[in-house]
């Protein structure tokens, strides 16, 4: 039976951080043969793994290493002068993470001229700091993960570009950005009574770049009790860093929710959910979920930090893209000189080919502080092949800071909540939504604009209007909403319209229950 296939790509072009302590997974793969190495080589391994019973990887580590505490482990650092390809002055370099309490065995390989060779662990590649250990007696531990370096912000220094560390997590940087949101290879049953399953990248193959290379190719093998997979990552650094992903999955057993291209990020509070006691006005890596449907609609959902876990979704026949964005890029919105939340990148997934019908699912989990990643978003296809049959999909993953993906017309600049001149009852809330963008800037003076709003569930619109804010040029949608049942969440939708012309994306807001 042929693969359930989406078209393939062209040529290269913190969910709580504690969850990185995922269950140990697949066994290490033996050294590769002399056959030419390519994506299909990894896919063959994934298919073979899927046909065999799942076998957890032996996670034993030397007693000396296991006895190290968190700070002692952090004192182990890769020696930069030992970086892969540094001696050859290639544009990309790779350094490795040492295994530790949260980093299970990951096997590394290098691909040169279509031939793969194993990269063994060498204790001499690491500086163990003040730790009094004897790593030369530990044998081949393999590694905990990897990070790629590239001269992203200037020729004098090779910055971190992309990191693969823990389960199937990875994150990247574009020029000028600081680490924020993460992505994963796959999410399995993120919500549910049985708990989430965390697939792991258990083996990587790093393709040696040419001396003038502008992109780096990485292959990875994914494994878990119910899914195996082959991945190809083509990383193109720049003002916008592009990671083009090709994947082929094989299910060992059925899963309830298969989440493709998952994002993980943090939202503690912001202008739509202010904090009373912190001097910082906002604390978040991302402030909204943006979705583009195949029907041409653009949706913006402001993120929230709920009391109880909230799972919502946007169903559609076709997906044009979705992403977790940090639209507010003003330092004064955060006032954090260390975290610099205004420099956190946005991530946008652009499917390659048709992904068919499905839904974008958003999971929001309450968090007391900024140390936990509490937001997850991913695509769930309606149709998943049965165990043993392949599922192919590809996408472009855009990491952006200076030029964010936006709708072609108007888009939400901010969402604020709270009373104005008039007091609010316990079952009422007022929402202030500012829209900006080319479709609004081009309106002639005096153009009539109206707010089109609805409360599809548990809400009554008491007042809604739209007007231009003279000080900023934005158009403001103001609505007052009553909640019949204050214990339940309320879905709200709104956009601006002039005559028959829709001027903006749809503001899709979730007002949590008490």
Which residue ranges define each predicted feature?
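N-terminal secretory signal peptides that target proteins for export/translocation
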Residues: 1-13
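Bacterial N-terminal signal peptides
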Residues: 18-30
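Terminal accessory/anchoring regions of large secretory-pathway or extracellular enzymes
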Residues: 34-70, 74-79, 98, 333-514
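Solvent-exposed N-terminal domain segments of exported/luminal and surface proteins
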Residues: 39-40, 47-192
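A contiguous, surface-exposed recognition patch within enzymatic or periplasmic domains that forms
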Residues: 71, 163-165, 177, 256, ...
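Beta-strand cores of secreted/periplasmic/IMS beta-sandwich domains, seen most often
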Residues: 107-114, 243-253, 395-397
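Extended, loop-rich substrate-binding clefts of extracytoplasmic carbohydrate-active enzymes
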Residues: 180-238, 356-364, 368, 372
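Acidic, contiguous internal or C-terminal segments within carbohydrate-active enzymes
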Residues: 220-266
């Amino acid at each position: 039976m042929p693969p359930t296939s989406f078209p393939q790509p062209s040529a290269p072009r913190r969910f709580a951080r504690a969850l990185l302590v995922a269950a140990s997974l697949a066994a290490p793969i033996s050294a590769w043969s002399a056959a030419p190495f390519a994506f299909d080589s990894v896919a063959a391994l994934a298919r073979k793994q899927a046909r065999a019973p799942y076998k957890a990887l032996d996670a034993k580590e030397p007693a000396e290493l296991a006895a190290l505490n968190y700070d002692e482990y952090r004192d182990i650092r890769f020696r930069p002068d030992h970086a892969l390809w540094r001696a050859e002055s290639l544009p990309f370099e790779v350094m490795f993470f040492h295994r530790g309490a949260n980093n299970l065995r990951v096997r590394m390989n290098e691909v040169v001229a279509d031939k793969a060779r194993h990269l063994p662990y060498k204790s001499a590649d690491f500086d163990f700091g003040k730790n009094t250990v004897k790593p030369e007696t530990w044998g081949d531990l393999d590694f905990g993960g990897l990070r790629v370096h590239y001269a992203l912000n200037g020729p004098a220094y090779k910055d971190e570009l992309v990191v693969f560390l823990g389960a199937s997590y990875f994150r990247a940087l574009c020029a000028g950005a600081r680490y924020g949101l993460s992505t994963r290879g796959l999410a399995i049953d993120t919500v549910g009574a049985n708990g989430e399953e965390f697939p792991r990248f258990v083996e990587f193959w790093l393709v040696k770049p040419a001396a003038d290379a502008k992109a780096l190719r990485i292959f990875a093998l994914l494994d878990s009790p119910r899914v195996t997979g082959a991945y190809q990552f083509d990383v193109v650094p720049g003002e916008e860093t592009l990671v083009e992903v090709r994947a082929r999955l094989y299910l060992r057993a059925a899963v309830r929710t298969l989440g493709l291209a998952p994002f993980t990020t943090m939202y503690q509070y912001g202008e739509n959910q202010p904090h009373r006691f912190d001097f910082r006005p906002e604390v978040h890596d991302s402030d909204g979920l943006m979705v583009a449907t195949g029907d041409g609609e653009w949706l913006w959902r402001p993120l929230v930090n709920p009391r109880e876990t909230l799972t919502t979704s946007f169903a559609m026949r076709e997906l044009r893209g979705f992403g977790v964005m940090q639209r507010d890029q003003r330092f004064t919105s955060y006032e954090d000189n260390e975290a610099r939340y205004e420099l956190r990148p946005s991530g946008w997934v652009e499917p390659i080919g048709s992904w068919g019908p499905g839904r974008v699912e958003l999971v929001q989990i309450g968090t007391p502080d900024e140390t936990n990643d509490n937001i997850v978003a991913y695509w769930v296809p309606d149709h998943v092949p049965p165990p043993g049959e392949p599922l192919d999909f590809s996408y472009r993953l855009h990491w952006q800071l200076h030029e964010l993906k936006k709708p072609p017309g108007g888009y939400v600049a901010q969402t604020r909540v709270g009373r104005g001149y008039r007091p609010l009852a316990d079952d009422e809330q007022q929402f202030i939504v500012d829209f900006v963008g080319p479709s609004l800037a081009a309106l002639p003076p005096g153009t009539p604009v109206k707010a089109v709003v609805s409360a599809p569930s548990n809400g009554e619109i008491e007042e809604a209007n739209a007007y231009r804010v003279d000080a900023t040029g934005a158009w403001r949608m103001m609505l007052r909403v009553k909640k019949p049942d204050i214990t339940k969440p309320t879905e709200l939708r709104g956009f601006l319209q002039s005559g028959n012309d829709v001027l903006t994306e749809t503001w899709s807001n979730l007002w949590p229950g008490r």
